[in-house]
Amino acid sequence: MLEVKPLQSAAASQGLLPLEVRDLALEVGGRRLIDGVDLALHDRGLTIIMGPNGAGKSMLLRLMHGLVPPTKGVILWAGTPMSASIRRRQAMVFQRPVLFRRTAIGNITHALWLRGMSGDERRSRAVEALRRAGLEHHALAPARVLSGGEQQRLCLARALSLDPDVLFLDEPTASLDPASTLAIERLLVDTKRRGTKVIMVTHDVGQARRLADDVIFLDRGRLTEFQSASRFFSQPESLAGRAFIAGELIV
């Protein structure tokens, strides 16, 4: 049986996240959705995954988080293949809010209960997570009565209450109004500053410019660029990347 090593490793102490993607591929129904992706990420900062429609952005994110098994290749955390134990050190927020039929604070304490935390710790973590998300005044409100933006912030607060090493987000602001989007962006900046690695899919070039430290750019399932955000937006190397930034590709 393969021994799962802790995420805090020599690679992490040297500024490298223990995430390596090697020759990753996913084929579904004879169609190659992800095609030979290789990359390694730093353990800090915010990485944006971008690309046109059908590029494989969300699928790559799900592969990284271990929600979908690859057809080929390997995903390593601290040199160890993805496992349930490793995935418990991560959290993910999807485009549409997924919430329990509970109050706002109940959504968080229930998630922490599932992780086996004590009552006092659940309560303190939930209160702090709601405060960070600006939802402390809605703690006892049923999640269903919150606005779309508030529900998404609650999903993010619940994820952050788990104190993950890595936070994955799949277009978390795609259907939100500007004010809700700004609130979530501020929360993500705060999350990054606190040392959590953030990996996010977005089709919004403006949002990527505001948030990204580095950019993964996909085109038809292939990695065409992986570089710092400043370089990607000033000197994109691929034709698809240049067209995307210029707004010439459908996103």
Positions of PLM-derived features:
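Catalytic Walker B motif of ABC-type/P-loop ATPase nucleotide-binding domains
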Residues: 167-170
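Conserved ABC ATPase "signature" region
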Residues: 120-138
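Helix-to-loop junction immediately C-terminal to a conserved catalytic motif
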Residues: 65
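H-loop/switch region of ABC-family ATPase nucleotide-binding domains
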Residues: 202-203
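Helix N-cap at the start of a conserved alpha-helix in ABC-type nucleotide-binding domains
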Residues: 178-180
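A short, surface-exposed alpha-helical micro-motif characterized by mixed small hydrophobic
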Residues: 208-210
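Conserved ABC ATPase signature
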Residues: 142-146, 150
